[in-house]
Amino acid sequence: MAADGDWQDFYEFQEPAGSVQEQENCNASPEAGAGAHAGGDSFPALASSLEEKLSLCFRPTSEAEPPRAAVRPITECSLLQGDEIWNALTDNYGNVMPVDWKSSHTRTLHLLTLNLSEKGMNDGLLFDASDEEELREQLDMHSIIVSCVNEEPLFTADQVIEEIEEMMQESPDPEDDETPTQSDRLSMLSQEIQTLKRSSMSSYEERVKRLSVSELNELLEEIEAAIKQYSEELVQQLALRDELEFEKEVENSFISALIEVQNKQKEHKETAKKKKKLKSGSSQNGRSERSHMPGTYLTTVIPYEKKSGPPSVEDLQILTKILHAMKEDSEKVPSLLTDYILKVLCPT
């Protein structure tokens, strides 16, 4: 019986079919061993019986045994679900009412500390009806935008200048009595100049009347010489002005011709690229009567020798003629280019 109590925990590992028979064998084996070897050494018998019991208890289970449930690990959630203290805390947490700040004791102490009163606040917030209406009109953005849109168009600069002059004339100057303005000073200066002219003319007439005939002849010769000198200088200045104007015209014509030729060369390059892409036999049917291909003279390179100063007017005229011929793709380009090389680059 003692053996049954000791090995009761190992019976669950035995097969369900022969569990009773095996238990009887386990219970009967020690008695048989004890009877057989009662007279001899009992230690080997006990050892052999213990080995038999262990082999019966720890032998592998058969495939016919029903599967047992899988072992589930114990997690924190499973522990908290069965905890009474945790359930009591979480169940009562949602039932707590929020704190009303206005009716709290802290709010009353706060108001007392700030020394606020509803009467003073209301008095400060009250506005006069007229002030409120004026403020509303000032803050009316719609009326402001509409008024800006409906305004008259902008004045020109001349109109603004005229209005400023009218305002200057209409506005009284408080310092008129004390200090004269710039216009008054100018008028005074003009009056003084007129008086000086009159006095000089009168004095000059008196001085001429006092001169003798010989002195008058000398004065006349001096005046004629001065007139001749001034006339020659005037003619020279007019001729110089004409030369400068002509030089400017030549330079402008040269620049315009150069720009036109450059644009023509760009167009020619684009058309040449387009013609290369086209694969048709229209070139044989559409022959031109010209003796050269179109654009032959347009890409002519004009030799130029850089000098210390700018090119002269004659050089610019020759270059302008060559550029015009290049623009028109004329056959005169070789002859003009030859004349330019012989006369300008390599003069004899």
UniProtKB/Swiss-Prot annotation:
User: Which residue ranges are recorded for the region named Disordered?
Assistant: 11-40, 265-296
What keywords are annotated for this sequence in UniProt? Coiled coil, Disulfide bond, Phosphoprotein
Residue(s) carrying Phosphoserine: S130, S171, S190
Q: Which residues, by range, are in coiled-coil regions?
A: 206-280
Tell me yes or no: is Membrane among this UniProt entry's keywords. Answer: no
User: Does the keyword Ligase belong to this entry?
Assistant: no
User: What does this protein's UniProt record list under function?
Assistant: Involved in axonal outgrowth and fasciculation.
Q: Which family, according to the similarity comment?
A: Belongs to the zygin family.
UniProt subunit comment: Homodimer; disulfide-linked. May form heterodimers with FEZ1. Interacts with synaptotagmin.
Q: What is this protein called?
A: Fasciculation and elongation protein zeta-2
Instruction: Give the species this sequence originates from.
Output: Mus musculus
Q: Which gene encodes it?
A: Fez2
